[in-house]
């Protein structure tokens, strides 16, 4: 929940994938143009290309997939020598348009195409934190909405906001997420009110009653 218990119901989550791209060129003194291949130039073009190409248009409940670079590194203490390699780290939050395997193929194709034009080689490492998932609104989800409306008066919005969640480990099982407000989530002294707990308990009780009767 966001501002009050039951104002939102999550019916999916975006996936998260981290990546490291390392570009290998040829080291050399900057005064002797043509004797080196600058991996920094290639990396800059890779970054520009990845940021300029839309990954998708989003879905009804999920925004377009988004890639952000989070770190760039060149292991070079000299200011007038072109380095042998340069690297960058990125994170992608991707919607249900992709599985991580298909997204990896798309990103690798873009990266390698740019590197090839710059006569550089690359190494790309990926780490998937979670796949995107989505449950099509069904009678159970609408039943939960009615329960929330009855208990709280909220007309719960269906969405897929936020980061990854532990429900990503449930595989292809249909699911929804409904819980307490997240206004103090991950903070020191994370807490909730007793009144919110009572509301949520009543919601859960009514959901179980409606589902099993």
For every predicted segment, state its role.
Residues 1-52, 189-199:
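Fold-level recognition of mixed alpha/beta catalytic cores in primary-metabolism enzymes, strongest
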Residues 10-15, 79-84, 168-172:
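Short glycine/proline-enriched loop/turn "hinge" motifs that connect secondary-structure elements
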Residues 11, 30-73, 80-81, 96-123:
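Acidic-enriched catalytic cores of C-N bond-cleaving enzymes acting on peptides and small amides
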Residues 18-22, 87-91, 123-125:
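Beta-strand secondary-structure signal
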Residues 21, 90, 144, 169-170:
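Structural element of the ATP-grasp superfamily
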Residues 23, 81-86, 181:
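Short, flexible turn/loop "capping" segments at secondary-structure junctions
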Residues 66-75, 91, 95, 122-138, ...:
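A short beta-alpha structural unit
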Residues 147, 151-212:
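Zn-dependent metallopeptidase/amidohydrolase metal-coordination segment
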